[in-house]
Each structure stands twice: as structure tokens, then as C-alpha cells.
């Protein structure tokens, strides 16, 4: 993170009044604050799990909702309970929101009884009750631009819109996910972009996160009502519930391919929380059953695929597994289109410029990363390479080395990140030998077997002296065996046994519409991935930006901890014990370095930077890598074992630290080693 000089900036703030806002943003959350973050207080008053937290706009009030069906409004700065009221719900409260521009007087709650209630805090009364949903209400969303309007997401698959100015006690359906995904789909979370209140993000069952343009949807419905043929429909002329261009989908590029494997292992993928960055340009998703992902909404990118420059300098120019030249990007977009008839190998374009040496301090970081790699400390190596990549984003060697570390660590999603790094390295240096070979291995591990074979053949053509190395031979045997296994499986299925992916189900319950398939195929990929936590047990687990400039990412975890990462490097910087069982909720204060958390314990915990004289060891998880490895095993464990673990039973191999030697990749790679350069 950038270095800070608070004395200098204080003087500048005194001299320049315009610098006050930038000062507040700069010192909202800093690296020293994160290092000193500790428990300040526990707010006691609930008698059940605390499932939701919400700050008011000024940050002097904090609302909480619980399994006890009560909501409490706190004065968090003085650790006082200001108000407690029974909400009228008959089941667990999952969401609580202050209505904007209402003087912190109106509070909205959604609960497992399928109801949405609106409360007037000044008189402690419920003034509106909506019962339109037919399943549990999981999230409420509000928008500053529309102070009388709010939205709800529920497990009936509906996104509903409410307008308190209308006398009707009913809401309207804004989005019906069952129209696209079948009756079994469940909406879990939603949020409105703070900078563009017409942009609504929705998380639901499955790996896809959806962005909708509310204004386009309303305009489309108005035009439909005004159309002379609005009431005349035939089977072939059914009106689309959403207009073209009103929805965009986002997904981690490797997840759609992994879905069959996850389903076989009863591993469920569901977006449990979505939120926008303060400037509205990024979308953060906590993917249940997987990791935390950040999507760039401005510079969107398609999921990565196999894109290699055709032309390369002679293999004689390759030294120590890399060239002494630095290639430029071939300018081809990274769309995930692995067609059955193969893939295009685009021509490399542009002048190949000399490889720029790393500055001495980055060379030291790279050397430290190489040493960590040699000691099989894969996560440490990845973090060091990531630190160097942030400072030298055009160095092909760093991407190639980090790819090797990802391939060795083999956490969920690591092979896809390695694929991305290999492609980046090749775009910077089209003759990066190791990146070419690792790319073939990544494609194989990601189940793109035919593409892996093509990639390996291309590698042998570019680097003929490596064609008969033991590494090439071993990978070739693996690919051949996988192809035979795949063909054998298809033959056993018999005619018609291998149904195409896009074959629509005849069952209304699980049918996916053609429009939905098109939107999924056009999905955008993530920019950053954050690993270490575990999100498999609850479907309300949050992840949030921390800091006015979104410098950090925070997330709860099934192990009772919450995790803090640097946003740009994705490096894990702190883990704190926040609950005896599970941390679900993390809500940062709007302007202070102040964090409210809650989970299974019936308390709200407040965290802020503590004095240097205070001992923080009681809540700090020192072995962050060990905790992360244990969570990776927990995510891949049998669901019954996870349930027993959460009940307090000790499962050998799950609750203990250490990576386990059985996960190590075969090290006999011959001449093309997976070690870093």
C-alpha cells in the first residue's frame, strides 16, 4: 500500500480547506490502521443469531436484526442500545435497511416469514406490511435517488419493487428469475449502484451474478402497455419480460465448466452477497461454495481462453526457459469460445521490445518469492509475486512465475488464475517457453482436453528441442488417456446419450430459457479473486469494500473468523476471530475506520484501530496461511462432515492445519519445470 505521512497531510489540510475531503478519504482506512484493528466492544441485547447490520448515512446509528425477530438501533460510538422493538415478523430477520432521506426514522425489515415490514422508529410501530413473496425474504435494497422506493429479493425467485407513496399494500414484480431459470431458482441478495441508482445487481442460485437497468425495464413495460397489440399474444409471439440490453451477466470464467463436478459432490454455488464499490465502478460478490470475486464494470473482460501468437522467434533465442525480448499484446480479446472445431491462434503483432529489467527492490521481492517457491510455500510465493506484479505489470516473467505457484498450490480456481497469468505472460513475451507449456497443463486441468492437446502440439512446434522431454511426454500421455476416457464414456451412453449443453429441459421446474442461455454466454469475467475464507454453511455471508477508496476487501467465514485482503494485490493481510462459530455480517462505517460484525453469537462486535500499548493477540489469527488451507479443505469436504464440524465435532484432516503432502503435483516434469524463472 502507498506510504502515508499524516503530519504533512494535517498541515496541508489546515492550509487548504479543499483538502479536507481528500484527507478523510486517504485516512479512512490505512495499512497501519489495519495492523492495529482489534475488538473495541460487544453490543449485547439480542437473544438469537444476528443476521443483518446497517449503518445510517451519518454513521452515528447502527441497526441490527436477529433470529429473535427484534430489531435494535444502537449508538455504536457510546455502546448504547437506543431502541429495541419486535418487528411483527414470525421468523428470523434476514435484512434491515434505513429508508434514505427519512431522518433515520423509517426502518425496513425482511424475514423468513416471507414478509417485508416498514417501521416508524419514533413511535415504535409497524406502518406497512407486505406479504407478496411466497418464500423467505433474504435482502432489502434502497437507493438515495428514490427515497420512497425500495426492493426485495426472496427465495421465490422474485425481485419486487415497493413504492410507499402508493396506497396499495402490494408491490410489483420487477424481475421474475423463474421466467428464465425455472421455478427452482432462488434470489439471495441484491444491491443498487450508489452512483447510478438505475443499476441493480442481483445474486441468486448458481455462479452467475446479474446486473439490471431498472429504467430500461420500466420503459419497456410502459411501451408494452401502450402498444395496440399488448393484449394479443400467441405461443410464438410471447413478449420478452426484459428488453434487450437491460441485463448483463458476470461469472468467474472457470465456474460454469466446474458445475457438473460440484453438483456431483453436492457442492452448491450461490451468490450470498453483492455490493458496489463507493465509486460504483466495481462489483464485489461473495460466492457461496467458492471464493470472493471482484468484477470491473468499466473495463469488462470476457472469460479467458486459449490465445497464442502464431509467430515466434526461433527457439535458439530462448534462454533458460524465456526469451530476452518482450512481446506486445496481440490485441485479441479474451473471450471464452472454446469451439468444438478448435480455436484460432492469432498472429503476434508489433515490434518485440527488449525485456526491461526489474528495479533492484522488485528483483529482491522476486528472489524472495522464488525462495518461498523452492520451500513449497506456495501462498507466500503467490503473495510476493502479486506484490511485484502490482509494481511491474508488464513483466512477463512475474506472471509466468506466479502461474507456476498457482499450479502447485491447487486451491479452487488456482488453475484458472494460472491460465490467465500464462496468457498474460505470452501476450507480453510470445516466446515465453514455460508459459506456453503451463498453458497446456492448465487447459488439461480445467477439462479442456482437446484444446490442451492442440496447445501441446503448438508448443512442440514452437520449441522442437522440448518435444520429447519427459514433461511433454507425461502431459501427452495424460491428455491421450483423458481423450480415450471421454470417447469411451460417450460410446457407452449410446446414440443420443450425450445431450448438448443447450438442450432445454422439458420440465418447467428446471428449464432454462434461450434468452437466459444467450445472457450466460455473454457473461463477463472477474478482475480479482480473494481466497482464504470459507462460505458453505450459511447463505447470508457478506463481503464488503473497506475504505473510502475501496482499498481493502473484508469477508466473513465459516471458521468464525473474518478475513481482510488488499484489493489490488489480492494478498491476505489480516485474519481476526469474530465469532465462536460463523461470521456472517461485516458492515464498515461510512467515514471512520470502524467495522461492525455479527454471526451466530447473539452479539454485535465493533472493531477499530487499537492503541499500540494494547495486546491484540487474543483475537488475531497468526497462522493466516494455515487457516486458509483449512478452509480450502472445509469447502471441499463432504457436506455431512462440514455439518458435524460446525456442530463442534473434530474431523481429522479438516480442522487441523497444514496443506497435506498428498496434494502435491507430480514433480517429475523433465526439462520443462514448473519452478519459477
Swiss-Prot record:
Disulfide bonds: none
Transmembrane segment boundaries: none
Listed SUPFAM superfamilies: TPR-like (SSF48452), WD40 repeat-like (SSF50978)
UniProt xrefs under Pfam families: WD40
GO MF term (any one): histone deacetylase binding
Residue ranges, annotated region (Disordered): 487-509, 655-677
TPR repeat start-end pairs: 362-395, 397-432
Pathway field: Protein modification; protein ubiquitination
GO cellular component, one term: nucleoplasm
Biological processes annotated in GO: cellular response to insulin stimulus; glucose metabolic process; in utero embryonic development; intracellular chemical homeostasis; multicellular organism growth; negative regulation of fatty acid biosynthetic process; negative regulation of transcription by RNA polymerase II; protein ubiquitination
Chain positions of WD repeats: 45-84, 88-129, 132-172, 182-222, 265-305, 535-575, 578-617
InterPro entries cross-referenced by the UniProt entry: DCAF8, TPR-like_helical_dom_sf, TPR_rpt, WD40/YVTN_repeat-like_dom_sf, WD40_repeat_dom_sf, WD40_rpt
Residue positions where Phosphoserine is found in the record: 353, 511
Keyword terms: Phosphoprotein, Repeat, TPR repeat, Ubl conjugation pathway, WD repeat
Function of the molecule: May function as a substrate receptor for CUL4-DDB1 E3 ubiquitin-protein ligase complex.
The protein's name: WD and tetratricopeptide repeats protein 1
Gene: WDTC1
